[in-house]
Amino acid sequence: MNVILIIALFITYIFGGISASIIYHQTLSHKVIVLKPWFEKLMVVLALPAGTPVQWVGTHRQHHLFTDKDGDPHSPKLFGFWFAHCGWYISNKNTFICFLYSIAGIFRMFFDGYWRPRNRLEFNHLAKDISDVEFYRIISKPMNYMLILWLYAIVLCLIFYSIAGLIGFIFLWAILALIYNLGDAINSIAHIYGKKINNTNHAKNNYLLSLFTFGEGKHANHHANSQILSNAKLNMVYFILKTWKIFGLAKFQK
């Protein structure tokens, strides 16, 4: 058993969850969490595999404005499972192509580096507060984003290869495929399977999904009130934020 490889996989998983849940979602999109400016920028750079900050925030806010209605960019009710899961990133409804994209892992980072900052930008106007920050505007530009994400991917490959050779690279591919699919499952599975709390949309609380997505699986609660840090005391997000708060790096709503 390669203990160092296991630790590296766990750290990668944690950073993947922090990127989507704490940074892009709760901090940038909904302003539920306030981080020290320098620390926020550092964490956004680490979150770049999830997409550019401007595009991610704009698309997510559009989703909240038109949840499961005309105008929702990734509703499984409107477009089917695979388009909602990951096809909307690449504007493709072909099940096989969507499936290949979903399992691409580290190769998805290289593809996204070119594709994401150049496509699906129609909701960027909803993230003007993000693009008004010069640093976020700069790293969201196509060439800058591509270079940073490709460097990010190369560094990950070198780290995992140095730990366990080809096996390390295979495990890197697997953990990234898992992280991407867990994040994408919030847009697909959490709008199909689980418990509804109202009839205004199809968002559902999926407790099994919540266990692996830093509480994001409590999706119906989030859509009912996006200004509350959902499920905060029942997942790792709470403990991470408490640690950050102790060091004066974060403030968050209780």
Spans of model-derived segments:
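Non-catalytic, topology-defining segments of multipass membrane proteins
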Residues: 1-184, 218, 227-254
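Glycine/small-residue-rich hydrophobic helix-like segments
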Residues: 185-235
